[in-house]
């Protein structure tokens, strides 16, 4: 037991925390998971992207970052390695070169990225997060129920992280999933629709 391991923290605050999300609802989705879902969906970055139950807007914001080549660490104030002065002097000039190279790759496409949120307060939080992420001109947030969502013409991808667990009482879950399935069939023809859920019983009601 005479062996010790010494490690240096190169990241600082956890890397999944992008730095843009100030306002959250209950049980918000992890930013890295949200980005992974967008990539897994095969979205082409040009067609419509919709989250009609957007909560605090994380999935929509990550879609906007991916579509416009905005680096995931763009909003972080610093990383742990920037304070390694005694062990390994921080090379600010090299860092600025790397940072500027990433920034120069940012594009400004006109995607249609839209979210819907039933709660006025949560919809407001989503809009505030979009401003913090500087994508408020790309992402549009509507205060509406999913079944009343006005779907833009064309095709695209829908990703939903529906309420679950502490965000919803159990008796309403089956009804919610049935509503999602009905809305997909009635309004989202031509869209690839994804639902993030571990509730296999509830999935039976999607149809």
Name each model feature, range by range.
Residues 1-21:
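Non-catalytic substrate-recognition/targeting regions of SAM-dependent transferases
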Residues 3-5, 46-49, 112, 157, ...:
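Beta-sheet entry/capping signal
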């Amino acid at each position: 037991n005479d062996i010790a391991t010494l490690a240096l923290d190169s990241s600082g605050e956890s890397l999944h925390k992008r730095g843009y999300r100030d306002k959250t609802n209950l049980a918000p989705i992890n930013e890295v998971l949200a980005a992974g879902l967008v990539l897994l969906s095969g979205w082409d970055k040009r067609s419509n992207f919709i989250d009609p139950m957007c909560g605090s807007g994380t999935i929509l914001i990550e879609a906007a970052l991916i579509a416009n080549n905005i680096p995931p660490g763009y909003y972080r104030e610093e990383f742990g390695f920037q304070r390694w002065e005694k062990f390994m002097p921080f090379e600010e000039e090299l860092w600025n070169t790397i940072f500027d190279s990433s920034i120069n790759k940012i594009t400004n496409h006109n995607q249609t990225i839209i979210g819907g949120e039933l709660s006025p307060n949560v919809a407001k939080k989503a809009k505030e997060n979009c401003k913090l992420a500087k994508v408020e001109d790309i992402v549009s947030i509507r205060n509406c129920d999913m079944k009343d969502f006005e779907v833009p013409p064309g095709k695209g991808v829908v990703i939903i992280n529906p309420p679950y667990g502490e965000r919803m009482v159990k008796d309403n879950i089956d009804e919610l999933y049935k509503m999602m399935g009905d809305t997909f069939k009635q309004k989202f023809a031509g869209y690839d629709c994804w639902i993030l859920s571990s509730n296999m019983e509830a999935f039976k009601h999607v149809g």
